[in-house]
Amino acid sequence: AGDIDLDEQIMHITKSLQRMERQDVITPPKTRKGIRDITLPNFLVKELENYMSMIYDCNGETRLFEISKQSLYYPMKKYSEIARVPRIRIHDIRHSHVALLIEKGVSPLAIAERLGHDDIKITLGTYGHLYPNKQREIADLLNTL
């Protein structure tokens, strides 16, 4: 909980949680730019305030989400099959977040910063296919000159 400043609406990304040999291990982020601050939207701050208020003795050392991605695998698989939709991985939510940001016109540089990518080439190489083809827009713009 200490990595979230609800008053300032900021999440400080300073570490990474890895699962190694059935143990949770906290490590530094993979890259220098992996250490970053993420500004949180109002709706998420409200959700976090509500969630944290339900945790007994929540303090700066409290790990807010004790669940592991491994423990989500089987329920996700089961309910995806019931709903007859493709199963998504937790990491796919990150991909969806980027797709939404692109759709809303957020610049690739801002997205790279938010994701903690050291180089914009990583962002564009991974998510470049999500950018809409703007050739018609460009031609129309040039027609106005």
Each model region followed by its residue ranges:
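A short, basic/aromatic helix-end/turn motif that makes direct DNA contacts
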Residues: 1-4, 112-118, 128
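Ser/Thr-centric signal marking residues that sit
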Residues: 31, 96, 122-126
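Short, flexible helix/strand-to-coil boundary loops that buttress conserved ligand/catalytic motifs
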Residues: 8, 52, 124, 139
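Hydrophobic side chains within well-formed alpha-helices
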Residues: 44, 72, 120-123, 138
